[in-house]
C-alpha cells in the first residue's frame, strides 16, 4: 500500500515501510501472521482419517493480509484481526478483533472518519475505541457471508450477510437487504456512478431468485425507504386479421409450441425414422430460436433480427415474415389458426397463421421504459417469445424478477380477441409494507419470490419456474401442489449451464439438485419428461459431486444421456436439502462424445445434440467447442435401451434446446442461423 512518500508491504517476516521514491527501509516491525483455523473440508478430511485437524497454511490464494494507509496510520488485517501502527515509526497503536468473510481476507475501511471492518463497528483511528456500532437485522437466508470482500461508500457499508448485497447506513439504523443480488465468487459487487454493479452468479444458493449475468442496479424509487411499484394498464391494438381465429387445432403429430406441449415435456407420442438424412436446410438469420411445427408450416424466429418466419415444412421456403418491437427469444405458439408470441420489447402478438397478418398486439405495463440488455434496448418488463395456452387462455409473464422494476406481471388473455381475463403483479414478497425485507423460505438458503420464465402447466396447476398458480393466477404454495413438474433452475432459456445449475422434476427448486443420484430424481443440463419416463443430457456432475472416484474420475464420463422412470410420490415428501422427491429408477445410460445442448424424444427414438468433447482436447479446444467453433454432433438413440442408432454432424453447433419433432421428422436450429430438416433416408 502506498501513501505519499511511504510504501508499506507485509511479508512472512513482518511489516516493512520503505521510501516510495528510492526503496530505502524506514522501519520494520515483526507482525506475526497466525495460521488460519482449518476449513470445514480440511476438518472433515482429518476426522475421516482419525486425525486432529491442523491449522491451514499461512497464505492461500484467497486469504492474505490487508493493508490500508491514512496520512499517519497503517492498518493491518490478518485472519480476522486488525492492528493499527504509526506510519511514522511502526509503533503499535491498538489491536482488535475484526472478523472476515467466508474464505476471504479481513476487510478494513476508513469512512466517515472511522475505521470499519466486518463486525460493523466504527472505531476511532487513533485509539481503536468503538465509537459507533451499526445494526443489521436480516442475516439470512444464507448461512455465511459470500466468498468475496465487502465494500463501503461515504453513506453505506455494503456486505453480504443475507447472501446478497446488503446496504447498512453509516449513520442511523437504515438497512436495505437484497439477498437476490450477489456477485461472482472472489470479485464482489462494485458501487459506482450511483449504481451497484455485480458480476455473473455462479452458485445455487437462492437460485430461484438470484439475478444472473452482469447487472447494473439503481434505486428506481428515488427513496431508499420506499419500494418501486408498478400497476397494470392493459393496451390492446387490433390488427386487420382481428377476430379471424377459430382455425384447425394442432394434431398430435405437430409440435405446436415450445417443447411440444404446455407441460414443456420435449416428448411427442409420434414415431420417427431410425436413420435420418438432411431433407432441407435454410438460413433464417443470425440466431434462430427452436422451431415449432403446425400442419404444413414450420415457425421459427431470428432472435436478434426481431423477426418471425413461417417456412414450408416440405422444402423450407419462406411463406411470410413478421417484425416485432424487440428480440423474440423463444419460439411462438400455434393455436387454432393463430400464432402467438411475446417480444423483449414487452408486447405480445397474435398473427393469422396462414399469412402472418396481425390480429392484435397487447402490452400490459403502464409505461414504455427501456433498459440495455446484451447491447440492445428492450423493455424493463420483457415477455418471452413462447406463450402458454391452457384452457383456451394465453398465459405469459412480463418482467424479470419479483424484486426488480416493481415485480413481474402475469397475464391470461383470450387468444382470439386479446381480451385480458386474468392478471396479477408478483412483487417480493416482503415481510411488511413499511420496509423492504424479503421473506425467507423455510430452508435450503432460499427466498420466497421468483424470476420470470416461460410458463408451463401440469393438470390444473400453472408454473413460472418455482412459482405455482391456479388458472385464475392466484398463487399457490409448493407444498400444496398435487403434481411434480419440469423445473430448470437457471430458467428454460439459459444457454450457459454451470457446475451448479440443473433441470429437474420436482415441486420446488432445492439446494443440490438431488446431487445427480438416481433414486433422487433427474438432474441434468436439459431434460425430456412425459410424466413417466425421462431422458436427460449431462455435461456436469449434478450437485457437483463426482460419483465414487472424486478427482480420479475421467471427466469425459460425465457427458452422457440418462433415462429413468418415475414411480410415484411415495408415502411422504423428503424435505431435506438433498431430496429424494418421489420414486425414480434408472433405465439406461449412454456416454456421448459431446456436451449436450438439447434433448427431445419420440415414441421410438431420442435425439441428443451438442458440441464435441473428445479425448485429447486441450483447454483451448474445449473453449472453442463451447464457442461453437468445432461444429455440432447429434446422436439418434433407441428410446428403449439407449443404443446409438446414428451419429449426425453439423457445420455449426445446435442452439440451446433447439430441436423439434413433427410428422416423423426432426427439425434442428443451428448457431450459424440455419434450420435443418432431417427425415427418413
Name these PLM-found stretches.
Residues 1-681:
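Noncatalytic, solvent-exposed loop/strand surfaces
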